Amino acid sequence: MDCVFCAIAGNRQPAYRICEDEHFIVLLDIFPLRPAHVLIVSREHAPFLKDLSVAARDRLLELSERVAAALRTLGHGHEGINLLINDGPASNQHVPHLHLHLIPRRSGDLLPLAWRALTRFLPLGRARIEARLQAHAERLRSALMVADQHV
């Protein structure tokens, strides 16, 4: 049985896709810790960072910088963005498939972040969250297209 990220990569599972390339799919986390919480998901099924190809590892940081710039353009993460890889089960990796979290932060958001970390998998307010995810995905896709035109 495929993991959820393999199913997304194979177009067998829907996702709020932002962009993709030969190595990664950029999408919104469906259980976001903060607004515009993005995942960069490997197309390769690689449970650990060391399992990624060298080409994919090289591309990961470049792509994360591009996505972080788009987030900041849209007003997310001006004060900071957590870049997080949970590398293996003991690191709280919920899906055993390499993915990088980009979590926009701002001063004083620790309490709401902690609350969301505790409640993020509960079905509370899912319709509202889904609407927000769709809006964030559209805005991020547009921001990345504009940025690509200026390169």
Model-derived features: positions:
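HIT superfamily nucleotide-processing domains
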Residues: 1-151
